[in-house]
């Protein structure tokens, strides 16, 4: 058992998009409490405050995994637990955000507390991010030379 776990970890840690797909699949099978809660909330408000299908643990450009993604409006949502408060992870998250936004995605970062806390406030943040992404997509499609 331990030997197979070691091989599995090495395989998942291998560079490349295939490794990211494996990691994303594992994360879909074992979401955090906040990710489970947000998935339920997104299903609840989908078609109302938010429209369109979303994907969980989506691999973006073969380089990044985002917790939730609405492809129709290019909205990525990340749920950040305590680990994201470390100095290293804060820097990495800023780098990831810059790359995602430069690729034309709108990124909404939520803490576990925001997801598990005040539901009305969360709905407002989700609606605002969704409309921001929708408007951003409209602007980029109507830009000269596009």
Q: Where are these predicted regions, by residue range?
A:
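Acidic active-site catalytic centers that drive phospho-/nucleotidyl reactions
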Residues: 35, 67, 78-80, 93
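A short beta-strand motif that forms part of the nucleic acid-binding face
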Residues: 80-83, 114
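Hydrophobic side chains within alpha-helical segments
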Residues: 38, 70, 96-99
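Short, contiguous strand/loop micro-motifs
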Residues: 25-26, 82-84
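Catalytic cores of nucleic-acid endonucleases
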Residues: 87-134
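A short alpha-helix capping/helix-coil boundary motif
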Residues: 16-19, 74-78
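Active-site metal-binding core of divalent-cation-utilizing nuclease and nuclease-like domains
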Residues: 43, 47-76, 86-89
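Solvent-exposed, charged helical/coil patches
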Residues: 1-53, 134-146
């Amino acid at each position: 058992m331990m030997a197979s776990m070691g091989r599995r970890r090495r395989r998942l840690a291998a560079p490349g998009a295939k490794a990211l797909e494996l990691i994303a699949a594992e994360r879909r099978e074992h979401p955090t409490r906040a990710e489970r809660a947000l998935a339920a909330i997104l299903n609840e408000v989908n078609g109302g405050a938010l429209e369109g299908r979303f994907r969980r643990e989506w691999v973006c450009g073969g380089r990044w995994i985002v917790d939730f993604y609405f492809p129709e409006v290019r909205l990525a949502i990340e749920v950040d637990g305590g680990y994201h408060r470390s100095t290293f992870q804060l820097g990495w998250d800023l780098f990831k955000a810059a790359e995602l936004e430069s690729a034309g995605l709108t990124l909404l970062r939520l803490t576990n507390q925001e997801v598990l806390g005040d539901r009305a406030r969360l709905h407002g943040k989700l609606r605002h991010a969704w409309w921001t992404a929708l408007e951003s997509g409209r602007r980029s499609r109507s830009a000269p030379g596009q």
